[in-house]
């Protein structure tokens, strides 16, 4: 049995529309090369809440909360060709999207 090569691409952003847009763009590029693709698989959204004092000296009970969510998508590419990797390297992702690639 032959060992299949696999590439995992994880996209992270604070804006869910950016993640979905670029996940679909990556899928379109990979489909041109006849590689098998799974995804985008939505991973759990993490919410971060930060609490700060409104006043620097008094009124300890007066606080303000800031929250933001980080959205993640996972794309798996099975049996990528050299053309697949070249096309993925040529993609210019926006600064609001963080990309992790594991093979």
From Swiss-Prot:
GO BP terms, alphabetized: translation
One GO term describing the cellular component: ribosome
This protein's UniProt keywords: Ribonucleoprotein, Ribosomal protein
Cysteine disulfide links: none
Entry GO MF terms: structural constituent of ribosome; tRNA binding
One Pfam family of this chain: Ribosomal_S10
Family: Belongs to the universal ribosomal protein uS10 family.
HAMAP family noted in UniProt: Ribosomal_uS10
PANTHER family, sorted: 30S RIBOSOMAL PROTEIN S10 FAMILY MEMBER
Quaternary data: Part of the 30S ribosomal subunit.
Job description of the protein: Involved in the binding of tRNA to the ribosomes.
Protein name (Swiss-Prot/TrEMBL): Small ribosomal subunit protein uS10
Originating organism: Chlorobium phaeovibrioides (strain DSM 265 / 1930) (Prosthecochloris vibrioformis (strain DSM 265))
């Amino acid at each position: 049995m032959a060992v299949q090569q696999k590439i995992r691409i994880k996209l992270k952003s604070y804006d869910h529309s950016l993640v979905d847009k670029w996940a679909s763009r990556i899928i379109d590029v990979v489909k041109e090369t006849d590689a098998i693709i799974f995804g985008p698989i939505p991973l759990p959204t993490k919410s971060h809440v930060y609490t700060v004092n409104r006043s620097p000296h008094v009124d300890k009970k007066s606080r303000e909360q800031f929250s933001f969510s980080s959205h993640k998508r996972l794309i798996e590419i099975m049996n990528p060709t050299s053309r697949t990797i070249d096309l993925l390297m040529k993609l210019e992702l926006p600064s609001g999207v963080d990309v992790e690639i594991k093979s």
